[in-house]
Structure formats: structure tokens, C-alpha cells
């Protein structure tokens, strides 16, 4: 019978303790990034809800950090805004002081985005150079950083759609911008969750992991639909619930031709589809909870299923309240925040079925 080498065991334990310390540091960093991303999405939502997104008409990645500091600079910034259709057709009576109100939202949104790039890139470089990032995570983290750079380009692509002909941004580009933000958020959540300890409870059923994936993906699709609602101001189309214009299925959902374009450009149809998406997500999380409670009651997986259902139910209630009150700013932002919370938890729940990343020493022993 082989006798374990005490020196080898001590070396393994020492390496595992170091990895655990490194993982705690990475979790703290990624958690801070997630919080910053959450704030960025909320400020972006406020920018949209206050119609502030076209107030800055130029893309200045570096010196755009500095806002106008003098009356002359404010006049110049306002003059640039006066050139676009939004001002000419909708805000022609706006004063410089009123312009400042919409300018600060867009400026804050861009500033936070730049700041996130810094708080992601600099620690990534530091952790990489000091050997604190496990090899399996290096390129996924670089990929997230690259997506962040791409997201900046998508943001300007979105803004540019409202600078020449339209008086607002394209709902398609707005949805792309929000979905990309959610994908970056999901990537950080996925890695952070993998660096955390997991329960040893077995999945309730063999299909639990796939069902969790379906819920997370559908949550993202529902956010995409919500972005179309925001882009088309579709939240103002029907402000009643549960009926729409006194009917379960309104009569004017397919008035545009070709008929399929209604799903993307008819505000009433877009709101209808978003409602159906909410009912579907509610049903999916309810079924998931019932299955988990029946197959594996009081396990970690069952508790997560309960919490996910509760979050979706609260989000649905917030959505209904927002609709009935005709989308006041604070309720609209609460609804957007709830969407990101639901999606983030759905991703964490999905990742929970894969377990913690194995330690390097465990891999070496297995090999």
C-alpha cells in the first residue's frame, strides 16, 4: 500500500489555499464589475426614458470625458444638437438650460461605460501578470473585454441612427445594444459563479440543466422584446391589463404589410408579444419550481428554483404596474432593473448545475 508523501500533501494544500485566495480576489473584482454594469444599464435606461440619447452628437472616445465647462462650450454643444431632426421636429423650443438636463444623462452613460473598461482591463492585466488567473479563464476574460470594446462601437452605431433622418434611434440597434450589455453581464456572472463553491446536491432531474438553460435564454429574449417596446414607445399603446383595448387579442396587431413586420415595427404588436413572453417566462419558472420541489425538495436546486420563480413573479407585477401608470421614469427603471436581476439569477442558476471550476491540483492528481 502506497504511503502518501507528507511534503507532497503540504505542497498540494498550499497550492489550493493560494488558488482559493486568488479566486476570492477574482470574485470580488467580477462582482464589482457586475455592480458597475448594473448601474450602467440603469443609466442607459434612464437615458432612453428621458429621450436623452441623442443629446451628444459626436463620438469622442478620449476627450469626450470632459463635459462643456463654459457658457461658450455649452452653446457649441447645443448648436450641434440643433442640427439633428430630434431638435428641429420635436424640441425646437428647447433652451440651453433644458438641453443640459438631457445632456448629463447621456454623458453619464458614456462616462460609466468608459470607467467600466478601465476597472475591467487594468485588474485583468494585473491578475494575469501576477499569475492569479487560471489558464482556463484567461481568454474568456479577454473575450469579455473585447465584447466591451465592440459594445462601445454598437452604442455609437445606435446613436448615429437618429442623427440624420429619424427623431429617435433605431429600435433594432437599441435592442442589439441592450442584448450585448446583457451578454457581457452574463459572461462575468458565469465566470464568477464558477469560481464560487457549489452544493453537492444532485440535479432534481436529468433535464434540469437544459431547463435552466432554456429559462436563461428566454429571459434574454424577453429583454430583447422589452428593448423593442422601449424603442417604439410601445408601453403607451395599451395601458390596461389583463385586456388590451378591451380584448384578449386586439384586432389591429397585423395592420402593417408584410404581416411579419408588425412583430418589430407595430408598437401594439410588440407590446402584445412582450406580454406573451412574460406569461411564458412565468409558466417556465413555475414548472421548473414544481419539478424541483417534487424531485428534490429542500435541496439547493429547489431553493434556487423557488427564488427564480419569486423574482419573475415580482418582475411581472412591476411590469403591470409600470404599464398601468403609463411608464413613469422610476417605475420604468425599476422594471429594467428587475429584468437584469432575473436574467442574472437565471444565468447563475444555470451555471450552478456545472459545479465549481476544478482546482489545478485536482486536475494534476487526476491526470
Curated annotation (Swiss-Prot):
Keywords: Cell membrane, Heme biosynthesis, Iron, Membrane, Metal-binding, Oxidoreductase, Transmembrane, Transmembrane helix. Pfam families: COX15-CtaA. It is a multi-pass membrane protein. GO terms for biological process: heme A biosynthetic process. Heme binds at residues 274, 335. It is found in: Cell membrane. The chain crosses the membrane at residues 25-45, 111-131, 139-159, 174-194, 210-230, 276-296, 305-325, 327-347. Its EC number is 1.17.99.9. GO terms for molecular function: metal ion binding; oxidoreductase activity, acting on NAD(P)H, heme protein as acceptor. It catalyses: Fe(II)-heme o + 2 A + H2O = Fe(II)-heme a + 2 AH2. Pathway: Porphyrin-containing compound metabolism; heme A biosynthesis; heme A from heme O: step 1/1. InterPro entries: COX15/CtaA_fam, HemeA_Synthase_type2. Interacts with CtaB. Catalyzes the conversion of heme O to heme A by two successive hydroxylations of the methyl group at C8. The first hydroxylation forms heme I, the second hydroxylation results in an unstable dihydroxymethyl group, which spontaneously dehydrates, resulting in the formyl group of heme A. This is Heme A synthase.
